[in-house]
Regions:
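Post-DEXD/H (motif II) to motif III coupling segment of the RecA-like Helicase ATP-binding lobe
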Residues: 345-406
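Conserved interdomain linker/interface between the two RecA-like ATPase lobes of SF2 helicase motors
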Residues: 387-455
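Conserved helicase ATPase core of P-loop NTP-dependent helicases/translocases
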Residues: 282, 305-310, 327, 465-469, ...
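Conserved segment of the helicase C-terminal RecA-like domain
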Residues: 532-537, 541-571
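Long, largely alpha-helical accessory region at the distal end of helicase-like NTP-driven motors
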Residues: 194-223, 443-444, 448-449, 453, ...
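Walker A/P-loop
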Residues: 239-263
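PLD/PLD-like phosphodiesterase catalytic module centered on the HKD motif
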Residues: 1-224, 228
């Protein structure tokens, strides 16, 4: 029986007969739902990436749903993979524009069935040796694929299986009777669709007219969940007699309404709202009018170059006008009970400071989307470090506050075989070929709504002007705007875009902030990402909700830029500087919540990987910058847990560059109190051995011994009674770690004196460590490291045999988890058989300069099979090899760990257990002529798609 057939048999047995069998089959039937950890969309994308052809039979398709697959479908087209989509016009649900989007898919043939009540939802994928299908309740819509509660099942069958034959036959039968999708059919359908739409619109308008008066009288704006939480926080700050607070909120998340709701709650005698832009000022005043009780219009006034409504209860002022001495000093310093600084990151500027320092309101609120931007005074210090609420991009999308988006990281234009890079000459950036390429990409990925209203961000003014000319010459109405243009001219151009009189505004950084164009339905980035903050600001230009769009399309042209690594940092909002996090983000189709999606064309994704591999994210300057940002937020020296709580750099990045955090602080003169050499070395031990949180028992044993000395039996009984899922061996290993007997001789040179001492009866803290505890500074660092250990341990909590699939481990970690007496780092050379365990550590891409005796060519044969080499100078008759070939009979378990390349350091992805495939062993030779044995190993569980792609690409 072939391995594939055997796997199918066991998978079906587990899925349909006995759920208790241990087989983790690659083809086990699986229920697909949308929840926090998995989405139906992910399975469909994974199947598309592996298939040789595909067939969709689905009744309802939306533009947004189709957009979530476009990057993958384009990659398939480039590989020559074709597919078919069968749909219909059932109930008039599908829009004519969506059908037009289907026609753009060059590798997909689309037909329409007129069968009555067509309500199918099936996705079929043909692979080399088998077929799979997703059948259930999900249409090809964003909500069905990512958000709604759906029931679908993933089924796999052999090529000759009856089920796939029946499904495919039914599809073929309908296909033959269906009508090919054409422009002519779409035009015909459009007429009837628009007629029905007008009828529906008339009904809606009539209903709205009947209800208008009642609604107008009864409507009161109430806070959403996030605003309600922020309002409670603001009240709590005032209840503590604090007079300043800061709201950090992504663009478009309703900061102004939130502020108005708080003002309504406080009901000040006089209120002042300060902003830098008159356009924003007028919109803010109108927002406040919606929320606050209006007695008469004179309650609301403006203080600008043209208006002087200084007696208004609610005064809205531009900083340019207010900051003049004769303007702000006409008011008493206590004139306003409540003052708001919009775009508060500007408050450090001298114009703002004059106003900020003059007025003494009962309460002052700062609002900003980017508090980190100031290069002058600390915004956090200005508002007394009182952060009332913070909502960033991911959370805002999850809460449906922002307009959903589909982000596409696309491959930039290649000029005569040379990809765009940091030094590309302007003439190539605006060449006819590149402009045509831009038009092709923006057309393929499309937009939501009836007309295109787009912002394009470029690198220079000249590029903006040249590109606008080129696009306009091709019939695409485009205007370049720069800082050289007057405010009045900018506003005229913006209004033209809003009204659909032009399609593109092209700029450099004019619209990074302070400009509100809700109608924008496509944002194009034609410049390298050099700042994650600016990236989010530019993306945010399209995220304000508007009636003209359901989503915004974001197209990022990714060239051969050194700073591409900033893209996953920006999109994920993850400031940890942890490369693994960013690589996982790139490969995870569920990386963002709601109906929004993040998609990369294959070549563009590789460009980002290359940038991530090349950049050093643990540079001293990056660590120092992260430190200063957190210090700036808190107003004092942060501890390691502060970096976690402030969503900043991962402490492990600090440890990769400095022996301990104290060493970093001393290096940059951030601490006055000095530790002894032994105390500092002890902190190195805790930073490397306890803080990673590999085994919770380590920190628990330490905490217990910090209280008092114990006998071994007392400690053992206490731990076994109070801690779940530990053994006496776990306790013994923890003690060996703490008394350093786990390590090789000479470890004291690195870690200082052992932490504990023990004899046949008692376990106690060592004298040196007891002396260290008398130092308050040492104690502070120790407690921080113990808390960090507990926090980090959460990711290791659910592991079988102490190991979790796809977590990363070192050889030393394995030694600890399996309670070896000694650290195996120096003796596990590729693999080692010890007791009943055989860890195998594989570096997939080896440096070309390694010796011929270690140039093993281990490789994946598939997602669940691996060609593996023993150590050199081994033959089929070697005792070690014979032991490996009979590992099942001897009860020896193989554990597979793989890293992509040596540059990944000491850590390897755990891919699960495996077994030797009988008959696959072979005597072979290394490049230097020495003997070696090769064999195929079968993983008990196929490697997850994203990890497999990362390791093998």
């Amino acid at each position: 029986m072939s391995r594939l057939l055997n796997d199918f048999n066991q998978s079906l047995h587990k899925g349909f007969i006995d759920k208790h069998i241990s087989h983790k089959g690659n083809y086990t039937p699986k229920l697909l739902v949308n929840n926090k950890n998995e989405k139906v969309l992910s399975t469909i994308i994974d199947e598309l990436q592996k298939c040789e052809t595909f067939y969709f039979s689905v009744a309802f398709i939306t533009e947004s749903g189709l957009a979530s697959l476009k990057a993958q479908l384009l990659d398939l087209s480039n590989k020559g993979v074709k597919g078919k989509i069968l749909t219909s016009n059932y109930l008039g649900f599908n829009s004519p524009k969506m059908y037009g989007e289907l026609l753009k898919l060059k590798n997909v043939e689309v037909r329409l069935t007129d069968i009555a009540g067509f309500h199918a939802k099936g996705y079929i994928f043909e692979h080399k040796d088998y077929s799979s299908m997703v059948i259930g309740s999900s249409n090809l819509t964003s909500n069905a694929l990512k958000v709604n509660y759906e029931h679908n099942v993933l089924l796999s069958t052999m090529k000759n299986g009856d089920l796939v034959d029946s499904v495919k036959s039914e599809f073929d039968l309908l296909w033959q009777k269906s009508t090919p999708l054409t422009e002519q059919w779409i035009n015909s359908y459009k007429e009837s669709f628009e007629y029905r739409s007008l009828e529906k619109l008339a009904e809606v308008e009539q209903t709205q007219m009947l209800l208008a008066d009642k609604v107008k009288k009864s409507v009161e704006i109430v806070p959403n969940l996030m605003q309600a939480e922020a309002l409670r926080s603001l009240k709590a700050i005032r209840d503590k007699a604090k007079d300043k607070a800061l709201i950090i909120s992504a663009t478009g998340t309703g900061k102004t309404i939130l502020c108005a709701l708080d003002v309504r709650e406080v009901n000040p005698n006089k209120f002042l709202f300060i902003v830098h832009n008159e356009g924003i000022l007028n919109r803010a005043k109108e927002e406040f009018k919606k929320v606050l009780p209006i007695k008469n219009d004179s309650d609301f006034g403006l203080l600008t170059g043209k208006h002087r409504d200084v007696d208004a209860k609610y005064l809205f002022a531009t900083i340019q006008t207010l900051s003049r001495d004769d303007n702000f000093k006409q008011f008493d310093e206590n004139e306003f009970d409540y003052i708001v600084f919009d775009e508060a990151h500007r408050s450090a500027a001298s114009t703002y400071q004059r106003v900020f320092n003059y007025f003494k309101p009962k309460f002052m609120l700062g609002m900003t989307a980017t508090p980190e931007r100031s290069d002058e005074l600390s915004i956090f210090e200005l508002f007394d470090y009182n952060i009332a609420y913070e909502i960033r991009l991911q959370a805002a999308l999850e809460s449906d506050i922002l307009c959903p988006f589909h982000y596409f990281g696309v491959t930039d234009y290649v000029h005569q075989g040379i990809k765009e890079d940091d030094v590309t000459k302007l003439r190539y950036l605006t060449s006819d070929e590149r402009v045509n390429y831009i038009i092709q990409k923006t057309d393929y990925y499309g937009y939501s709504g009836e007309i295109l209203q787009e912002l394009i961000f470029v690198s220079s003014k000249k590029e903006a002007y040249d590109l606008a000319d080129k696009l306009s010459s091709k019939g695409i109405k485009s205007v370049a705007l720069t800082g050289d243009d007057s405010v009045n001219y900018r506003q005229i151009v913006i209004e033209k875009l809003k009204e659909g009189k032009i399609n593109y505004i092209i700029t450099v950084d004019l619209f990074n902030e302070g400009i509100d164009i809700p109608e924008v339905n496509q944002v194009v980035m034609l410049r390298p990402t050099e700042s994650s903050i600016i990236f989010i600001q530019q993306l945010g230009r399209g995220l304000r909700k508007s009636s003209n769009k359901e989503y915004v399309t974001v197209i990022d042209f990714i060239g051969n830029y050194k700073t591409n690594y900033l893209i996953p940092i920006a999109l994920s909002g993850d400031q940890s500087q942890n490369k693994d996090n960013y690589k996982k983000f790139l490969t995870n189709n569920d990386s963002i919540n709601g109906v929004s999606t993040i998609n990369f064309e294959e070549v563009a994704k590789k460009q980002i990987y290359n940038s991530l591999d090349a950049v050093s994210l643990n540079q001293n300057k990056l660590i120092l910058k992260a430190y200063e940002e957190v210090e700036n937020r808190l107003g004092h020296m942060p501890l390691l847990m502060d970096f976690i709580q402030q969503h900043s750099i991962d402490p492990s990045v600090i440890f990769s560059k400095f022996s301990n955090y104290y060493e970093f602080l001393v290096r940059y003169k951030k601490i006055d109190t000095l530790l002894t050499e032994n105390e500092s070395k002890n902190l190195v031990f805790f930073s490397r051995q306890i803080a990673p949180g590999l085994k919770r028992i380590d920190s628990l044993v330490l905490e217990e011994l910090l209280k008092n000395e114990l006998t071994y039996d007392e400690l053992k009984n206490k731990m076994l009674n109070e801690v779940k899922d530990i053994t006496e061996d776990d306790i013994d290993t923890s003690l060996r770690i703490l008394d350093f007997s786990f390590y090789n001789a000479g470890i004291e040179k690195i870690y200082g004196s052992p932490i504990i001492e023990r004899n046949e009866r008692m376990i106690r803290l060592s004298d040196a460590f007891t002396n260290a505890l008398s130092n308050q500074t040492f104690n502070m660092f120790l407690e921080d490291l113990i808390e960090l250990s507990k926090y980090n341990n959460e990711k290791y909590q659910k592991g079988k045999n102490g190991l979790i699939l796809y977590n990363k481990y070192s050889r030393e970690d394995f030694s600890k988890i399996f309670n070896w007496n000694k650290n195996g780092s120096s003796v596990i050379m590729g693999y080692m058989i010890k007791s009943q365990e055989m860890p195998i550590f594989i570096t997939y891409d080896k440096h070309e300069d390694i010796s011929d005796s270690t140039k093993y060519e281990d490789e994946f044969l598939s997602q669940d099979e691996l060609k593996w080499f023993t150590k050199s100078n081994r033959t089929l008759e070697s005792k070690e090899v014979q032991k490996i070939l009979s590992h099942r009979a001897k009860g020896i378990k193989m554990y597979i760990f793989v890293q992509k390349k040596d540059d990944d350091g000491i850590y390897f992805y755990y891919l699960g257990t495996a077994g030797y495939i009988e008959g696959s062993e072979k005597q072979d030779k290394m490049p230097n002529g020495s003997n070696v044995v090769t064999m195929d190993l079968a993983l008990d569980k196929a490697v997850r798609d994203d990890i497999y792609r990362y390791l093998t690409n």
